[in-house]
Amino acid sequence: MYAVLATGGKQYRVQEGDVIYVEKLDAEVDSTVELTEVLAVANGEGIKVGAPVVEGAKVTAKVLAQGKQKKVIVFKYKAKKDYRRKNGHRQPYTKLVIEKIEA
């Protein structure tokens, strides 16, 4: 059984036991979160596709960690004008393990 869920503006195809990295969620480490924006659910018999979400479906996940990704360097310059700007960015994320898919 797998599900397609949306969180943080992205879509993820998950099964029970999968570990995924999503955009930062407001949750404590070792707590559980319910993701209710389930776009599709598939089991052995077939697939249910929502319009836009599957009614009554939810994915339960446990928060493993909160952290920041590797630094991305943003470097702007203008040729021949002695203009240089170096900036870094680290995007926060939440690491989840999928515990249960309910449809």
Curated annotation (Swiss-Prot):
GO terms for cellular component: cytoplasm; ribonucleoprotein complex; ribosome. Keywords: Ribonucleoprotein, Ribosomal protein, RNA-binding, rRNA-binding. Pfam families: Ribosomal_L21p. GO terms for biological process: translation. One of its GO terms (molecular function) is structural constituent of ribosome. The keyword Ribonucleoprotein applies. Part of the 50S ribosomal subunit. Contacts protein L20. NCBIfam families: L21 (TIGR00061). Belongs to the bacterial ribosomal protein bL21 family. HAMAP family: Ribosomal_bL21. This protein binds to 23S rRNA in the presence of protein L20. This is Large ribosomal subunit protein bL21. It comes from Clostridium botulinum (strain Alaska E43 / Type E3). The gene is rplU.
